[in-house]
């Protein structure tokens, strides 16, 4: 991609414009490695992006991203904007510099050309700014004049572009631009990290499928730049990948890979782009029951609770019994026998939200991979028993953090390189439960309501541009069409607003901040109630997520 001259006139230079690849149905997971587990093949957050903003600028940037992503799905937390401790002087990029990272959204044109133009007008307003317009000389020429425009939020952040989809699904595509000489090496590098082969591969472009359902595809792609162009790493944005068997992966990487915490490692690709690797499973020795009670008692004395209790779940207590279980209460079928007493003690003690720790305004300060409580061969939340919505619910709870696991934790701030202790823990990475999905009760509803949710969301495009802070979705995390099929799922009503700057610091000694999370009622007799049910006055803690 050339900001001035375009792709040099080659026939395949428009491959990233969406004309060739936007609507083709090449993104099924049939090309993934046979070694991939079901959990890996169906993880929509396998790739995510951290954006580092200057102090006081995170909220408008986060809202701008959420508003744009709402056109694909109202609850698609693939990005998290955080703030660095202090403003830093930026180096002026070379003239005609090409940012190494881009995000391309493919929107279905069947909803009308005006809808795409309306979103394009939104990207022309602050904090968005126009970066450049790409010229395409291939055999497929875009008919919309805006379909080759690229925008950016702030210096050092990814490029953003909108493309019409002629047929097929809507797509969120992460694109990394590679040096001409490093393209082959970069392809092998990301193939190693993603543990899958590209579904479409050309001499200068390839696409890795990340997640696919009936309506949305999430993709990761590489684009080879001409010889006279060099990509510039986005110093205020970092790609994060979930990986398995980090110990086996590290020796195979081309550049040094150093741990920044127990759960995350930092490395670079061949072009100097900073990469975070999050260990999918952190096998950690379980604390003794006495230690759990002691830690819980200590936090009850140190954390003043509001007038209404806040039910929460530890990674273990959030596990639910299979759908066909005859017992009304939760059963920890995935727990080792020796740990039943421990989790019974946790359930009897006053629970604390697993995200109620102190935060700072810096980035990457929290190990996010909790211990896997289910079998590594077949995770409980993706077992063959139970409805898809139930399995997705257990998948969601399987990645919650326990505050007990953070005692003495340290992590390196990727932005500053400083070591940070557990008293300065910051942004939770992509896989802790966000506030809008933190309701502890799932509500299965008739399948026709779930099947109409997606159509209702699309019909909303007839109105003004959706604002994620005001969107009321009719689905919980587990019941979204993003995780389930149209035929059956559970659904709940949830609502959340973007966190205000004052909520970026949550201390153990301050009252817990509630988020609006309406209660829901159990409607399916086959679904056992979870360990804690939200009462009329119960509120949940605001969560930071990507």
UniProtKB/Swiss-Prot annotation:
Polar residues bias spans: 304-324, 347-361
Disordered: annotated segments: 1-37, 285-361, 488-546
Cystines in this chain: none
Signal peptide: none
InterPro entries (alphabetical): FAM124, FAM124_dom
Top-rank lineage group of the source organism: Eukaryota
Compositionally biased intervals (Low complexity): 24-36, 488-511
Short name of one Pfam family: FAM124
Biased composition (Basic residues): 285-302
Family: Belongs to the FAM124 family.
Name this polypeptide is given: Protein FAM124A
Gene name per UniProt: FAM124A
């Amino acid at each position: 991609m050339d900001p001035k001259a375009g792709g040099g006139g080659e026939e395949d230079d428009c491959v990233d414009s969406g004309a060739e690849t936007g609507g083709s149905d090449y993104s099924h997971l049939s090309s993934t490695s046979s070694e991939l587990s079901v959990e890996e093949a169906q993880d929509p957050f396998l790739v995510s992006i951290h954006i580092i903003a200057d102090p006081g600028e995170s909220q408008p940037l986060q809202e701008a991203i959420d508003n744009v992503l709402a056109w694909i799905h109202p609850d698609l937390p693939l990005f998290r904007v955080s703030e660095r401790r202090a403003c830093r002087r930026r180096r002026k990029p070379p003239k005609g510099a090409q940012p190494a990272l881009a995000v391309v959204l493919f929107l279905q044109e069947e909803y009308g050309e005006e809808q795409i133009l309306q979103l394009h007008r939104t990207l022309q307003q602050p904090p968005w700014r126009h970066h450049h317009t790409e010229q395409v000389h291939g055999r497929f020429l875009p008919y919309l004049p805006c379909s080759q425009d690229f925008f950016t939020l702030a210096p050092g952040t990814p490029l953003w572009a909108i493309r019409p989809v002629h047929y097929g699904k809507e797509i969120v595509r992460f694109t990394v631009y590679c040096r001409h000489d490093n393209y082959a090496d970069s392809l092998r590098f990301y193939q190693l990290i993603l543990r899958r082969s590209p579904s479409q591969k050309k001499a200068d472009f390839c696409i890795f499928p990340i997640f696919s359902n009936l309506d949305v595809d999430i993709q990761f792609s590489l684009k080879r730049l001409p010889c006279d162009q060099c990509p510039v790493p986005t110093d205020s944005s970092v790609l994060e990948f979930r990986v398995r068997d980090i110990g086996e992966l590290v020796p195979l990487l081309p550049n040094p890979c150093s741990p920044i915490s127990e759960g995350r490692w930092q490395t670079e690709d061949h072009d100097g782009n900073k990469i975070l690797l999050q260990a999918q499973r952190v096998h950690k020795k379980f604390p003794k029951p006495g230690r759990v009670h002691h830690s819980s008692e200590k936090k009850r004395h140190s954390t003043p609770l509001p007038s209404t209790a806040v039910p929460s779940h530890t990674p273990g207590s959030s596990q639910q019994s299979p759908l066909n279980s005859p017992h009304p209460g939760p059963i920890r079928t995935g727990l080792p026998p020796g740990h039943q007493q421990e989790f019974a003690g946790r359930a009897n003690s006053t629970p604390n939200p697993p995200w109620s720790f102190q935060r700072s305004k810096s980035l990457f300060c929290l190990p996010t991979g909790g211990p896997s409580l289910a079998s590594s061969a077949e995770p409980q939340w993706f077992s063959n028993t139970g409805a898809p919505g139930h399995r997705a619910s257990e998948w969601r709870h399987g990645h919650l953090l326990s505050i007990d696991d953070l005692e003495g934790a340290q992590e390196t701030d990727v932005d500053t390189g400083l070591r940070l202790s557990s008293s300065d823990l910051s942004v939770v990475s992509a896989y802790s439960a966000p506030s809008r999905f933190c309701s502890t009760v799932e509500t299965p509803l008739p399948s026709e309501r779930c099947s109409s949710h997606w159509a209702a969301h699309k019909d909303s495009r007839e109105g003004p541009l959706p604002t994620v802070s005001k969107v009321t979705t009719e689905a919980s995390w587990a019941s979204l069409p993003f995780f389930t099929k149209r035929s059956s799922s559970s659904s709940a009503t949830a609502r959340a607003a973007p966190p205000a700057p004052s909520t970026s610091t949550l201390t153990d000694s301050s009252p817990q901040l509630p988020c609006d999370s309406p209660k829901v009622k159990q409607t399916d007799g086959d679904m056992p109630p979870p360990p804690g049910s939200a009462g009329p006055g119960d509120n949940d803690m605001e969560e930071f997520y990507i």
